[in-house]
Amino acid sequence: MTETKEERVHQVFEKIYKRYDVMNSVISFQRHKAWRKDTMKRMNVQEGQSALDVCCGTADWAIALGKAVGPTGHVEGLDFSENMLSIGKKKIADERLDHVFLRHGNAMELPYADDTFDFVTIGFGLRNVPDYMQVLREMARVTKPGGKVVCLETSQPTIPVFKQLYFFYFRHVMPLFGKMFAKSYDEYSWLQESTLSFPGRDRLAQMFKEVGLTDVQVKPYSGGAAAMHLGVKESYDEESRNVTC
């Protein structure tokens, strides 16, 4: 029987979870932390707000959100890999963030009511889901009117020489790093496949608009190796005005 994308991705993350954080730093040359820090600055998270991190993995972004909203806020992280969540739960306990909660679940069907969170984020996870649009629709659904949907993801550089180097790195070097540091050549071969097949920045921005998000911002990082996409969910008052105009 043919293995689905969802099944394969689940197997990948259930296997590499122990070395995932180390490999993130190796693969991105530590730049992923700076990308997330700049993204958080652009989000302008305030104390007391609420956030959901979809495909939260080992909870680095959920932890950053938890620190930003403070003890009066509320943060949820959701992932379908229980092994990844086990690492995240330990990190949250070490940080003593009692207002950050992790849940096992599917990004394709978020177990939350409409209009629940001020922010809904996904970091380096959208490329791994079976249906990009379905996940974006779900993220928009659970975001409050006026709230923000944010994606930080690998991207595809457009500068000719850098683009060639980037593709060479992902096709040939990254799987070798996976074998060296995580003993997982096949798993990191899959991750490079998902990266190279992911939509470019312009297409992803259009997808944000297609699920009803407005004021879409795009910020490339490190020559386009990664990019942030941020969109705002219209308030119901704005939607009503648009209908009557």
Swiss-Prot record:
CDD domains: AdoMet_MTases. Belongs to the class I-like SAM-binding methyltransferase superfamily. MenG/UbiE family. This is Demethylmenaquinone methyltransferase. GO terms for biological process: menaquinone biosynthetic process; methylation. Pathway: Quinol/quinone metabolism; menaquinone biosynthesis; menaquinol from 1,4-dihydroxy-2-naphthoate: step 2/2. GO terms for molecular function: demethylmenaquinone methyltransferase activity. Its EC number is 2.1.1.163. Pfam families: Ubie_methyltran. Gene3D superfamilies: Vaccinia Virus protein VP39. Methyltransferase required for the conversion of demethylmenaquinol (DMKH2) to menaquinol (MKH2). The keyword Methyltransferase applies. Keywords: Menaquinone biosynthesis, Methyltransferase, S-adenosyl-L-methionine, Transferase. It comes from the Bacteria. S-adenosyl-L-methionine binds at T58, D79, N106, A107. It catalyses: a 2-demethylmenaquinol + S-adenosyl-L-methionine = a menaquinol + S-adenosyl-L-homocysteine + H(+). InterPro entries: MenG_heptapren (IPR014122), SAM-dependent_MTases_sf (IPR029063), UbiE/COQ5_MeTrFase (IPR004033), UbiE/COQ5_MeTrFase_CS (IPR023576).
